[in-house]
């Protein structure tokens, strides 16, 4: 299957529109924040099993958000690296108070892409 998005910059608006539900985003923020904390913990006190916690912590929150609230499949299944990077970018935009602005921009970009595909 040919992937539509070739760059993270092109992918991120799509990623945001797949995270329109506020509860889904909050679950992603929790999961991504916990991943950061577990990573720091695993680096400071290295034990192999702590590194296994990283995907478990991150994906468990994200996937509950997608399947229960957003009602879609995680973009991770098709774009794993772009999705991982986008999790951190989305958390950053939330922390600096720009997530609503970025989500509105993303919706316009994706609407234009969809219009151009017709």
Q: Which residues does each PLM region occupy?
A:
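Structural signal for membrane-spanning alpha-helices in multi-pass inner-membrane proteins
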Residues: 39-42, 65-66, 94
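Membrane interfacial helix-start motif at the N-side
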Residues: 8-29
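Core segments of transmembrane alpha-helices
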Residues: 27-41
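Membrane-water interface of alpha-helical transmembrane segments
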Residues: 18-25, 49, 76, 80
């Amino acid at each position: 299957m040919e992937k539509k998005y070739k760059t993270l910059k092109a992918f991120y608006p799509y990623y945001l529109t797949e995270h329109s539900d506020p509860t889904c985003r909050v679950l992603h923020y929790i999961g991504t924040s916990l991943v950061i904390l577990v990573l720091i913990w695993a680096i400071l006190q290295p034990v192999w099993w702590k590194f296994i916690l990283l995907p478990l912590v991150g994906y468990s929150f994200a996937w509950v958000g997608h399947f229960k609230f957003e009602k879609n499949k995680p973009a991770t299944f098709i774009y794993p690296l772009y999705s991982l990077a986008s999790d951190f970018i989305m958390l950053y935009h939330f922390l600096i108070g720009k997530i609503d602005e970025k989500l509105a921009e993303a919706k316009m970009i994706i609407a234009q892409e969809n219009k151009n595909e017709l």
